[in-house]
Amino acid sequence: MVKIGKVEMYINEELESGKKLHFVLIDPDDTHPEMAGRIAELCENVGVNAIMVGGSTGAEGEMLDNVVKAIKESSSLPVILFPGSHSGISKYADAIFFMSLLNSRNPFFITGAQALGAFTVKRYGLEPIPMAYIIVEPGETVGWVGDAKPIPRHKPKLAAAYALAGQYLGMRLVYLEAGSGSPEPVPPEMVRIVKSVIDVPLIVGGGIRTGDQVRELTKAGADIIVTGTAIESTKSIDEAKRKLEEIRRGLK
């Protein structure tokens, strides 16, 4: 029997208690270890639920390891890898979103990278969390790198079909991604329709910058909100703290 690991169990228990969750994504390509540690400490202090580490390009090897270690040294939050490919794996993390980019046109991002990385995940003893990853317009860098056919913003049923297929394939999470730095988030109506057909937790990320957007997305059905660029683009730790607190207020 497949056992659910500690991180996934923690996520499920938090959601079952009626909470909406906030994960912060740190890209090692844009954030040096010292800053990653400071952001992680801040995240824990304001009530963020987990740290995701990864990026579309460049997040691998010693650079990735050093960022993960700095985060682990600075906070007790779960660290979940969010790899761009099979090279984005660090033995120092707690878990990995073992995800398939369902609407890629390239089989490498659907099952190829996963096959190449599977033995590394097993050897490192990382907790794999199976996840259906779906790119929504505009898709930004991740859409281009992952050779995705982004779901049109006005076609929510297409997103729902992919999400339900992911659930039926055994994925225990669905992630709707507008792309890091997207001008706007996934449309709330798309979130609502996807949530109405799936029975697994729904993550929404990309283009989320304000508490009002968070409020709208969680009201539509998002269980977990992911922010990255909104925090990375702040000019100081104090500004990052204010932004995190604003986003946290949107969850309530």
Curated annotation (Swiss-Prot):
Record-level GO cellular component terms: cytoplasm
Pfam families noted in UniProt: PcrB
Superkingdom: Archaea
EC number, UniProt record: 2.5.1.41
Cofactor entry: Mg(2+)
One Gene Ontology term from the biological process aspect of the record: glycerophospholipid biosynthetic process
Compartment list: Cytoplasm
GO molecular function: imidazoleglycerol-phosphate synthase activity; magnesium ion binding; phosphoglycerol geranylgeranyltransferase activity
Catalysed reaction, written as an equation: sn-glycerol 1-phosphate + (2E,6E,10E)-geranylgeranyl diphosphate = sn-3-O-(geranylgeranyl)glycerol 1-phosphate + diphosphate
Biological pathway: Membrane lipid metabolism; glycerophospholipid metabolism
Binding site for Mg(2+): 27, 56
Keywords per UniProt: Cytoplasm, Lipid biosynthesis, Lipid metabolism, Magnesium, Metal-binding, Phospholipid biosynthesis, Phospholipid metabolism, Transferase
Keyword Cytoplasm belongs to the record: yes
Predominant location: cytoplasm
UniProt: sn-glycerol 1-phosphate binding residues: 175-181, 206-207, 228-229
Annotated InterPro entries: GGGP/HepGP_synthase_sf (IPR038597), GGGP_HepGP_synthase (IPR008205), GGGP_synth (IPR010946), IGPS_HisA/HisF (IPR050064)
UniProt key word Lipid metabolism: yes
Function: Prenyltransferase that catalyzes the transfer of the geranylgeranyl moiety of geranylgeranyl diphosphate (GGPP) to the C3 hydroxyl of sn-glycerol-1-phosphate (G1P). This reaction is the first ether-bond-formation step in the biosynthesis of archaeal membrane lipids.
HAMAP family reported in the protein's UniProt record: GGGP_HepGP_synthase
Family: Belongs to the GGGP/HepGP synthase family. Group II subfamily.
Protein name according to UniProt: Geranylgeranylglyceryl phosphate synthase
Annotated source species: Pyrococcus abyssi (strain GE5 / Orsay)
